[in-house]
């Protein structure tokens, strides 16, 4: 199978690169920026014609869309709205149209921010609705809706609190801060679950294999083409629940930087243009039952990531 990955130089895209090394599938990694030491093909996903040309050139069967505008507060800048909307809503629609035309699959990464800041107290299910409180959440929700409207084969995965060995993220920031500061304040009134990008990438590999086995193999047998029956919205994060404060304490423990005095504080101590979800735990029952995806506990994955970072 030929798989095109967008946003290949980000956290998830880089984890897909790691897994692709042991895959028999052909991967085409794309981004708008070049990363030193990485083979990256230029692709502007806001340009539908460019996507179509690349899909045709490489005979693409599936696209994994890891690209997005992810700066939540920065998205509130009125001068940035057009770009945010293009990246988070128009681009996913373009990718969906391209896959619709070749009966391919679009795996699209979305976010817990589509639920807004609703005061939930139980894990959010895929069919729950919310009201996004900022431009980021709103445009990500629009992206989901536009993908579905094309009628393409799609798996939309909402995730949260992503971290990895790559790029800038909360885990790496707190590893540095707990190592260099004597005291640190971290919010305790926002609850969710961290997601190790490598675990999410492994789940995506499972989904791609399922698509290849159930749809592409059917087409090769010259049976009438059928849509992918598992198309839909899914949730993925690691197992367990914690606050940002809990997350930081565990980072310090695994990093060996517990000398830093980490103190809990309220979200109001760090004013932001966008209200963060107070409870954004995602229910993962669907992705586990439909695809048989294994979901590691968040502390186990965190320890693995930090050990990898310390060995670099």
List PLM regions with ranges.
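Mid/C-terminal beta-alpha module of Rossmann-like enzyme folds, strongest
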Residues: 203, 210-271
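Rossmann-fold cofactor-recognition segment
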Residues: 33-47
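N-terminal Rossmann NAD(P)H-binding glycine-rich loop of SDR-like oxidoreductase domains
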Residues: 3-22
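Amphipathic terminal alpha-helices
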Residues: 298-312
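NAD(P)H-binding glycine-rich loop region in Rossmannoid oxidoreductase-like domains
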Residues: 45-87
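Catalytic helix-loop patch of NAD(P)-dependent Rossmann-fold dehydrogenases
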Residues: 82-94, 114-157, 161-164
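NAD(P)-dependent short-chain dehydrogenase/reductase
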Residues: 145-206
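SDR active-site strand-loop-helix element
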Residues: 6, 30, 63-67, 106-111, ...
């Amino acid at each position: 199978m030929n798989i095109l990955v967008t946003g290949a130089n980000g956290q998830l895209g880089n984890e897909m690169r790691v897994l692709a090394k042991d895959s028999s599938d052909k991967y085409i990694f794309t981004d708008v920026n070049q990363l030193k030491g990485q083979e990256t093909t230029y692709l502007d996903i806001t340009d539908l014609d460019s996507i179509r040309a690349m899909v045709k050139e490489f005979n693409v069967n599936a696209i994994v869309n890891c690209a997005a505008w992810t700066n939540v507060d920065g998205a509130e800048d009125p001068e940035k709205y057009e770009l945010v909307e293009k990246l988070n809503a128009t681009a996913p629609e373009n990718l969906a149209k391209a896959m619709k035309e070749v009966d391919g699959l679009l795996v699209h990464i979305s976010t817990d921010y589509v639920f807004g800041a609703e005061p939930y107290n139980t894990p959010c299910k895929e069919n729950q609705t919310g009201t996004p409180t900022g431009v980021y959440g709103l445009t990500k929700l629009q992206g989901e809706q536009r993908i579905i409207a094309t009628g393409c084969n799609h798996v939309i995965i909402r995730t949260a609190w992503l971290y990895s060995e790559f790029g800038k993220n909360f885990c790496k920031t707190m590893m540095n801060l707990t190592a260099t500061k004597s005291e640190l304040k971290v919010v305790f009134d926002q609850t969710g679950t961290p997601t190790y990008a490598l675990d999410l990438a492994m789940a995506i590999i499972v989904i791609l294999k399922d698509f290849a086995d159930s749809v592409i193999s059917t087409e090769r047998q010259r049976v009438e083409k059928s849509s992918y029956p598992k198309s839909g919205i899914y949730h993925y994060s690691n197992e367990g629940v914690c606050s940002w404060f809990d997350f930081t304490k565990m980072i310090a423990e695994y990093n060996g930087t517990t000398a830093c005095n980490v103190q809990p504080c309220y979200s109001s101590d760090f004013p932001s243009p966008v209200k963060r979800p107070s409870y954004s735990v995602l229910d993962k029952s669907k992705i586990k039952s439909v695809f048989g995806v294994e979901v590691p506990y968040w502390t186990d994955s965190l320890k693995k990531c930090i050990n990898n970072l310390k060995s670099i």
